[in-house]
Amino acid sequence: MRRFIAIVFMALAGFGAALAHAQQRYAVISLIGDRMEIAYAKGVEGQPVDRIERRYIALDDSRIDRYTLLAANEVIKKVVPGPDPVLLQAFDRSYFEVSAGTGAIIEWTRQLVKDAKPRVTHAIVITKIQYEGVPAIQKAFVGGGTLEGVGFFVGREAPPKGMDPNSGGPGFLSPFAYFQVTLVDLSTGKVVREEKGTASTALSATNTDSGNAWDALSAERKLQTIIDLVKRELEIVLPKVLKGA
Protein backbone atom coordinates (compact mmCIF):
# COMPACT_ATOMS: atom_id res chain seq x y z
CA MET A 1 0.00 0.00 0.00
CA ARG A 2 2.77 2.44 0.95
CA ARG A 3 4.56 1.63 -2.27
CA PHE A 4 1.38 2.35 -4.22
CA ILE A 5 0.94 5.71 -2.45
CA ALA A 6 4.58 6.62 -3.17
CA ILE A 7 4.07 5.82 -6.86
CA VAL A 8 0.92 7.96 -6.93
CA PHE A 9 2.79 10.90 -5.35
CA MET A 10 5.61 10.54 -7.87
CA ALA A 11 3.11 10.49 -10.73
CA LEU A 12 1.34 13.57 -9.37
CA ALA A 13 4.67 15.37 -8.95
CA GLY A 14 5.57 14.58 -12.54
CA PHE A 15 2.15 15.76 -13.72
CA GLY A 16 2.54 18.98 -11.73
CA ALA A 17 5.94 19.70 -13.27
CA ALA A 18 4.58 19.04 -16.77
CA LEU A 19 1.60 21.32 -16.09
CA ALA A 20 3.91 24.10 -14.84
CA HIS A 21 5.98 23.89 -18.02
CA ALA A 22 2.83 23.87 -20.15
CA GLN A 23 1.80 27.17 -18.55
CA GLN A 24 5.13 28.80 -19.37
CA ARG A 25 6.04 30.57 -22.57
CA TYR A 26 9.47 31.83 -23.49
CA ALA A 27 10.79 34.85 -25.34
CA VAL A 28 14.30 34.29 -26.70
CA ILE A 29 16.83 37.03 -27.43
CA SER A 30 20.30 36.45 -28.90
CA LEU A 31 22.93 39.16 -28.44
CA ILE A 32 26.12 37.49 -29.67
CA GLY A 33 26.20 38.16 -33.41
CA ASP A 34 26.95 41.86 -33.83
CA ARG A 35 30.68 41.33 -34.34
CA MET A 36 33.38 38.70 -34.52
CA GLU A 37 36.59 38.83 -32.49
CA ILE A 38 39.82 37.92 -34.27
CA ALA A 39 42.71 37.26 -31.88
CA TYR A 40 46.32 36.81 -32.99
CA ALA A 41 49.41 35.56 -31.22
CA LYS A 42 51.98 38.35 -31.33
CA GLY A 43 55.70 37.77 -31.70
CA VAL A 44 57.18 36.61 -28.40
CA GLU A 45 60.44 37.61 -26.78
CA GLY A 46 61.39 36.30 -23.36
CA GLN A 47 58.87 34.97 -20.89
CA PRO A 48 55.27 34.46 -22.00
CA VAL A 49 52.85 37.24 -21.07
CA ASP A 50 49.49 38.32 -22.44
CA ARG A 51 50.58 38.95 -26.02
CA ILE A 52 47.29 38.74 -27.85
CA GLU A 53 46.30 41.25 -30.48
CA ARG A 54 42.52 41.55 -30.76
CA ARG A 55 40.59 42.94 -33.70
CA TYR A 56 36.87 43.03 -34.34
CA ILE A 57 34.88 42.55 -37.52
CA ALA A 58 31.45 44.18 -37.43
CA LEU A 59 28.77 41.89 -38.85
CA ASP A 60 26.22 43.88 -40.81
CA ASP A 61 23.78 41.03 -41.15
CA SER A 62 22.27 39.19 -38.19
CA ARG A 63 22.77 35.65 -39.42
CA ILE A 64 24.52 34.35 -36.31
CA ASP A 65 21.76 35.65 -34.05
CA ARG A 66 19.01 34.38 -36.38
CA TYR A 67 20.43 30.88 -36.43
CA THR A 68 21.02 31.01 -32.68
CA LEU A 69 17.33 31.84 -32.18
CA LEU A 70 16.27 28.99 -34.47
CA ALA A 71 18.53 26.55 -32.62
CA ALA A 72 17.14 27.69 -29.26
CA ASN A 73 13.61 27.33 -30.61
CA GLU A 74 14.26 23.68 -31.52
CA VAL A 75 15.73 22.90 -28.09
CA ILE A 76 12.87 24.55 -26.19
CA LYS A 77 10.22 22.68 -28.18
CA LYS A 78 12.01 19.42 -27.52
CA VAL A 79 12.78 19.90 -23.82
CA VAL A 80 9.66 21.78 -22.62
CA PRO A 81 6.86 21.35 -25.17
CA GLY A 82 4.26 24.09 -24.93
CA PRO A 83 3.30 27.35 -26.66
CA ASP A 84 5.65 28.42 -29.45
CA PRO A 85 8.54 30.57 -28.16
CA VAL A 86 8.66 34.21 -29.24
CA LEU A 87 11.93 34.87 -31.09
CA LEU A 88 13.18 38.45 -30.80
CA GLN A 89 16.01 40.34 -32.49
CA ALA A 90 17.51 43.51 -31.05
CA PHE A 91 19.32 46.03 -33.24
CA ASP A 92 20.40 48.56 -30.61
CA ARG A 93 24.15 47.91 -30.39
CA SER A 94 24.31 48.96 -26.74
CA TYR A 95 22.47 45.76 -25.78
CA PHE A 96 25.28 43.65 -27.24
CA GLU A 97 28.07 44.93 -24.97
CA VAL A 98 29.43 42.44 -22.42
CA SER A 99 29.04 45.08 -19.70
CA ALA A 100 25.41 45.87 -20.61
CA GLY A 101 23.83 43.32 -18.27
CA THR A 102 20.27 42.09 -18.79
CA GLY A 103 18.20 44.82 -17.11
CA ALA A 104 17.59 46.98 -20.18
CA ILE A 105 16.97 44.08 -22.55
CA ILE A 106 14.47 42.52 -20.13
CA GLU A 107 12.48 45.76 -19.95
CA TRP A 108 12.61 45.98 -23.76
CA THR A 109 11.34 42.40 -23.96
CA ARG A 110 8.50 43.07 -21.53
CA GLN A 111 7.23 45.90 -23.68
CA LEU A 112 7.36 43.82 -26.86
CA VAL A 113 5.53 40.78 -25.48
CA LYS A 114 3.10 42.38 -23.02
CA ASP A 115 0.08 41.75 -25.27
CA ALA A 116 1.13 38.31 -26.51
CA LYS A 117 -1.33 35.44 -26.20
CA PRO A 118 -0.61 33.01 -24.60
CA ARG A 119 1.21 35.17 -22.09
CA VAL A 120 5.01 35.17 -22.20
CA THR A 121 6.29 34.27 -18.72
CA HIS A 122 10.07 33.97 -19.12
CA ALA A 123 12.89 35.41 -21.20
CA ILE A 124 15.92 33.45 -22.35
CA VAL A 125 18.76 35.88 -23.03
CA ILE A 126 21.91 34.72 -24.83
CA THR A 127 24.81 37.11 -24.28
CA LYS A 128 28.55 37.26 -24.92
CA ILE A 129 31.02 36.56 -22.14
CA GLN A 130 34.76 36.94 -21.72
CA TYR A 131 36.49 33.63 -21.13
CA GLU A 132 40.03 32.39 -20.55
CA GLY A 133 39.75 30.51 -23.80
CA VAL A 134 43.21 30.76 -25.32
CA PRO A 135 43.99 27.30 -26.76
CA ALA A 136 46.32 25.42 -24.40
CA ILE A 137 48.90 24.91 -27.14
CA GLN A 138 49.22 28.70 -27.48
CA LYS A 139 49.88 29.56 -23.84
CA ALA A 140 53.60 28.98 -24.28
CA PHE A 141 53.53 31.81 -26.82
CA VAL A 142 50.99 34.27 -25.43
CA GLY A 143 50.48 33.42 -21.78
CA GLY A 144 47.03 34.06 -20.32
CA GLY A 145 44.30 36.15 -21.80
CA THR A 146 40.59 36.30 -22.44
CA LEU A 147 38.58 35.92 -25.61
CA GLU A 148 35.09 37.34 -26.04
CA GLY A 149 31.88 36.23 -27.71
CA VAL A 150 32.30 34.52 -31.07
CA GLY A 151 35.31 34.57 -33.34
CA PHE A 152 38.64 32.99 -34.17
CA PHE A 153 42.02 32.65 -32.53
CA VAL A 154 44.71 32.62 -35.23
CA GLY A 155 47.61 30.72 -33.72
CA ARG A 156 50.72 28.71 -34.35
CA GLU A 157 51.75 25.28 -33.22
CA ALA A 158 54.94 24.44 -31.36
CA PRO A 159 58.04 24.53 -33.60
CA PRO A 160 59.77 21.29 -34.56
CA LYS A 161 62.13 19.84 -31.95
CA GLY A 162 65.51 21.54 -31.87
CA MET A 163 64.28 24.83 -33.30
CA ASP A 164 64.06 28.17 -31.50
CA PRO A 165 61.02 27.86 -29.17
CA ASN A 166 59.99 31.39 -30.12
CA SER A 167 59.72 30.48 -33.79
CA GLY A 168 56.26 29.21 -34.65
CA GLY A 169 55.48 25.98 -36.39
CA PRO A 170 52.49 25.52 -38.71
CA GLY A 171 49.59 27.86 -38.08
CA PHE A 172 46.09 26.89 -37.01
CA LEU A 173 42.68 28.48 -36.74
CA SER A 174 40.63 28.04 -33.58
CA PRO A 175 36.95 29.08 -33.84
CA PHE A 176 35.27 29.78 -30.51
CA ALA A 177 31.86 30.64 -29.08
CA TYR A 178 31.75 31.94 -25.50
CA PHE A 179 28.31 32.95 -24.28
CA GLN A 180 25.91 32.82 -21.37
CA VAL A 181 22.29 31.65 -21.41
CA THR A 182 20.18 33.37 -18.76
CA LEU A 183 16.60 32.47 -17.84
CA VAL A 184 14.65 35.40 -16.38
CA ASP A 185 11.18 35.44 -14.80
CA LEU A 186 9.50 38.37 -16.56
CA SER A 187 7.04 38.98 -13.72
CA THR A 188 9.81 39.67 -11.20
CA GLY A 189 12.87 40.37 -13.36
CA LYS A 190 14.83 37.84 -11.31
CA VAL A 191 17.33 35.43 -12.81
CA VAL A 192 16.06 31.87 -12.44
CA ARG A 193 19.09 30.06 -13.80
CA GLU A 194 22.13 30.69 -16.00
CA GLU A 195 24.77 28.56 -17.68
CA LYS A 196 27.88 29.33 -19.70
CA GLY A 197 28.63 27.91 -23.13
CA THR A 198 32.34 27.60 -23.90
CA ALA A 199 32.90 25.87 -27.23
CA SER A 200 36.02 25.86 -29.38
CA THR A 201 37.90 23.69 -31.82
CA ALA A 202 41.08 23.89 -33.92
CA LEU A 203 41.77 23.61 -37.64
CA SER A 204 45.24 23.13 -39.09
CA ALA A 205 46.53 25.46 -41.79
CA THR A 206 49.08 22.99 -43.15
CA ASN A 207 46.93 22.30 -46.22
CA THR A 208 46.44 25.94 -47.23
CA ASP A 209 48.29 27.23 -50.30
CA SER A 210 49.42 30.35 -48.46
CA GLY A 211 50.32 28.67 -45.18
CA ASN A 212 48.31 31.42 -43.49
CA ALA A 213 45.95 30.00 -40.87
CA TRP A 214 43.32 32.64 -41.69
CA ASP A 215 42.97 31.10 -45.16
CA ALA A 216 42.03 27.68 -43.77
CA LEU A 217 38.35 28.58 -44.26
CA SER A 218 36.53 30.79 -46.75
CA ALA A 219 34.51 33.73 -45.41
CA GLU A 220 31.28 31.75 -45.78
CA ARG A 221 32.73 28.69 -44.06
CA LYS A 222 34.03 30.82 -41.20
CA LEU A 223 30.53 32.12 -40.54
CA GLN A 224 28.96 28.67 -40.86
CA THR A 225 31.58 27.18 -38.53
CA ILE A 226 30.66 29.69 -35.82
CA ILE A 227 26.94 29.01 -36.33
CA ASP A 228 27.49 25.25 -36.04
CA LEU A 229 29.62 25.72 -32.92
CA VAL A 230 26.94 27.83 -31.22
CA LYS A 231 24.20 25.37 -32.16
CA ARG A 232 26.06 22.37 -30.74
CA GLU A 233 26.85 24.19 -27.50
CA LEU A 234 23.26 25.42 -27.12
CA GLU A 235 22.04 21.83 -27.38
CA ILE A 236 24.15 21.10 -24.29
CA VAL A 237 23.65 24.28 -22.26
CA LEU A 238 20.03 25.29 -22.86
CA PRO A 239 18.44 22.09 -21.47
CA LYS A 240 20.34 22.71 -18.22
CA VAL A 241 18.86 26.19 -18.03
CA LEU A 242 15.34 24.97 -18.76
CA LYS A 243 15.46 22.04 -16.35
CA GLY A 244 13.16 22.75 -13.42
CA ALA A 245 12.33 26.21 -14.74
Predicted segments with their positions:
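C-terminal/domain-edge helix-coil "capping" segments
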Residues: 22-38, 139-144, 150, 154-245
